[in-house]
């Protein structure tokens, strides 16, 4: 058995409220490339930071929409892995927070996942009318569709560079971290805030923090237990 897994199982058995934070490493196991790994082929000549921002979208809506359409196609080919399914099976026992925008947790059955950075399979109005839609097909000329309410462009329903997280989702995630008896941190580098600050919120309330990651992360030093394994291997064993 993976070192540390027995101890994690013992911690899990005596807790009532579990919070789970997942990151890009979990989706990578399903074949979803990380944000920068997605810059291949035609798109390797573009800076992703210029495509994932409002300024870039306003400068060339068709280009940015095509990039996201390509990324959506990659996501559509991916399937939830054993780690996603394990969390979905235990969904009534935990609060699930994810940095991933691929919707794999929801597809696995975790219908109440808190998607901190949005969902690439949804669109929202570029203006402040607030309407959200399942992403429609692009127009023949490759331009993004228009909002059915106000007529402005639709944009991906994800958090772009320079934007704040949805305050309601962030508040719910912070509450889950502060109220939990145990926090699992799965497949995240710990570099992106405010998500990376959630484990510290749990630790300040004396909740053990357990990291599941085959690679080192910036959160390792503050964790009570680090399990060097992948989500697809460790989570089914942990929640068995």
Predicted regions and their residues:
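Conserved catalytic core of sirtuin-type NAD+-dependent deacylases
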Residues: 1-240
């Amino acid at each position: 058995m993976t070192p540390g897994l027995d101890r994690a199982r013992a911690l899990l058995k005596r807790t009532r409220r579990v919070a789970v934070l997942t990151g890009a490493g979990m989706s990578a196991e399903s074949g979803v490339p990380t944000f920068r790994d997605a810059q291949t082929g035609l798109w390797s000549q573009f800076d992703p930071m210029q495509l994932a921002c409002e300024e870039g979208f306003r400068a060339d809506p068709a280009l940015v929409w095509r990039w996201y359409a390509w990324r959506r196609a990659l996501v559509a080919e991916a399937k939830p892995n054993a780690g996603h399914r394990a969390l979905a099976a235990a969904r009534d026992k935990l609060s699930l927070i994810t940095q991933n925008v691929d919707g794999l947790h929801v597809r696995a059955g975790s219908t109440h996942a808190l998607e901190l950075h949005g969902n690439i399979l949804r669109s929202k109005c570029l203006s402040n009318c607030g309407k959200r839609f399942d992403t429609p097909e692009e127009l023949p000329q490759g331009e993004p569709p228009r909002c059915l309410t106000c007529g402005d462009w639709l944009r991906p329903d994800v958090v772009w560079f320079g934007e704040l997280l949805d305050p309601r989702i962030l508040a719910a995630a912070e509450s889950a971290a502060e109220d939990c008896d145990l926090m699992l941190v799965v497949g995240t580098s710990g570099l992106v805030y405010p998500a990376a600050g959630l484990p510290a919120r749990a630790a300040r309330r004396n909740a053990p923090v357990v990291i599941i990651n085959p690679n080192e992360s910036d959160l390792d030093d503050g964790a009570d237990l680090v399990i060097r394994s992948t989500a697809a291997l460790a989570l089914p064993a942990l929640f068995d």
